[in-house]
């Protein structure tokens, strides 16, 4: 089954506790507008953890899927306290939504 952008938008509400989908507007976490295709820890107006700065990846669907499954296992020392999205279909939906934010 294909990823569902609308379901991802609904699921993103959990992310929106700490992140925005608006360019240049950060909360506790960085804005996720344009995150797909962006290098990790690359927004100038956000203070990333040292762990995220060292992660040194470009956010694509595969990297996001792995990270969203268990953020602290992928980037030990990340400031992100969200435990992750265990359901693969839900992660795919969120990623499909994130891909629309450009």
PLM features: what roles do these ranges have?
Residues 1-12:
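Electrostatic cytochrome c docking/interface patches
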Residues 44-63:
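Short Fe-S-cluster ligation motifs
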Residues 58-102:
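C-terminal capping alpha-helices of c-type cytochrome domains
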Residues 27-33:
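Short cysteine/histidine-rich zinc-coordinating motifs and their immediately flanking basic loops
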Residues 13-21, 94, 98:
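The canonical Cys-X-X-Cys-His
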Residues 35, 39-42, 71-75:
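A short secondary-structure junction motif
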